[in-house]
Structure formats: C-alpha cells, structure tokens
C-alpha cells in the first residue's frame, strides 16, 4: 500500500446537518444553505448531498458553481447570489431551474426581454448600505413592479445584505434594516435579511428566509463572540497531520527561516507535515496553539511551505507519528484566525493540497 502525506481534513457531515437545522430553527422560517466557494473549502457537492433531503435551497456565487451541483444530481433550488453577468446566462438559468439575484436595472431589462419556458425565481436585492451589489432605494419599487408584471418571473423574494452585523454594538445594522423596511414598505413578498451574523446576533431582523453561510460550518462570525447562540454550533472541519521528525536543541538555537524563534532552554522541537502550501497561515505567530496527541503545544518558528515546527518540551510522550490537530475543536478555526490576524473565511477557503475525508466514508475528494 502506498503511503501518503499525512495532512488531511475530516468533514463531519452530521455536524453540518446539525448546524443547518439550528440556523433554520433560529430564524423561524426557511433557510438557504450557502455552499459557495466549494462550501467554504468543505466540498460543495458532498455537503449539498448531505443536506439535500432537508434543505430549503442552496446559495452559490455564480452559475459555474450551480452547474457543478446540478451535474452531481442536486435537484433542490439553487440561488445565484451574484446573479447573472451576461444575458446569455439566462438560457442556462432557465434550463437548470435556477433562481437568480437581480441587483441592477439592466438585469431587469434583460429578464423582460427573455422568453423563458418556465417562470424564473428572482431575489430582488436592495443596496441598503453595503454598497456592493443591489438596487438603489429609489429604483427598488419600480424594479419590483416591473418584475411582477412579467410572466417569465416566478416568486420574487426581497433581500439585502448586512455589512457589519458581526459588530453587535454598531448602529449600522439597524440603519440598514430601516432602509430596507422603508424601501420595501407595502410590497407583499417574502424577505431575506439575515446572513450568519444576522441570525446569531440580531433576532429582531429575522424574516422569511435566512442565509446561513459560515455558521453552517460551525464558526460564529460575530467578532466579539459575545452571543450565547454560538454554543450549539458544531465544528465541521478538523484538520490533521502528524509529526514527521523530532529534534533536541540546546538553548540559544534559532528555529526555521529568519530565526523568528530562538530557544531559551533545551527544547524538543517537533516537525509537522503542514505548511502554507497546504493552507496553514504563513502569518501564524509563535505561541499559536496546536493539539499534539490531545495536548496543547505552541507553534515555534516561521511556517514554511511544507512544514511547521512545534515546541514539545512539555510533552515528552509526543514522537514521530503523533497526531497533530491544526484546527477543529481545539484550537477552533476562529481561534487560529485570531492568532494570525485573519478571518475564519480565509482559512477555510484557503486549504490546498489537503485530502478531504467525510465521516463514515473512506474515499478522499
């Protein structure tokens, strides 16, 4: 049997389903499972297959991601969060029964000129203050009325996106909610306001549809982590590797590139088969926690392309072959991100060269 490099990720699909149920229960309505960017690095097809029996729908960034799911046999509704970029995409949207965000007047006109064999579900997006995609408030009502008059348009959902909902003491979220409420006043249509931060931190903004993304994967995006609602979330991704070498160094010896760490005492140094080419953050600082055979040990030295080093001095039982957890339950991905001045989104989406295993299955994707 061929040996393989030990760096790998384990994806807990039961935890994924648990988190989706929690998000839907929390919002009190329906919930789109956001599986864009390959399900935040977890594997979009396999995650969608795990959720399809109970999901209200999926959300992806673009049509390429939607077609990947359709080609894998996913039949549940799929929303294109960025809408369509070219008029020609409407043929594929209709053919594959996709929903699309409408975020500009030209898209309304394009849809009006398109003859669809069946009605297309539309999510009409208001720019309430994020200032990325979305119609201006003064355009919103006219767009809604135009879409309602078109036979090629099915149900229209009104939506907006919160920019600072991860900051619980910031007034911007309530300001955006007020803009959305004013712009949609009198429109009889389902609404969608809350992303993960909105669901976890802003109960007063719950509406017909939630859009859980990061929380699906067990991470609370709220920066203060002051909400008690993060407790029920279960981490979905656990990233592991092994010690491939152990060295004994005297005091005063530099470790790794640039000598960013110098031993202050006789030190056992473990070498782990995981580096920034795998997706472990290059900017992880000395002291960043790792779990070696279930015991917390600090990162020492600069992370290199294929390896990193850990202080095993206080863990004499650890040796070559010992299991190392880079993130998962402890440390959590949010904790690791904080040590690196990064976001959990970046870490999850940045895994490379790492095999994925799904609990209950032996095959890597």
UniProtKB/Swiss-Prot annotation:
UniProt binding sites for substrate: 132, 305
Superkingdom of origin: Bacteria
SMART domains reported in the protein's UniProt record: Ala_racemase_C
CC cofactor: pyridoxal 5'-phosphate
EC class name: isomerase
Entry's EC annotation: 5.1.1.1
Alphabetical list of SUPFAM superfamilies matching this protein: Alanine racemase C-terminal domain-like (SSF50621), PLP-binding barrel (SSF51419)
Pfam annotation, one family: Ala_racemase_C
Regions crossing the membrane: none
Pathway membership: Amino-acid biosynthesis; D-alanine biosynthesis; D-alanine from L-alanine: step 1/1
Catalytic activity as recorded in UniProt: L-alanine = D-alanine
Function in brief: Catalyzes the interconversion of L-alanine and D-alanine. May also act on other amino acids.
Family under the similarity heading: Belongs to the alanine racemase family.
Name of the featured protein: Alanine racemase
Organism of derivation: Xylella fastidiosa (strain Temecula1 / ATCC 700964)
Originating gene: alr
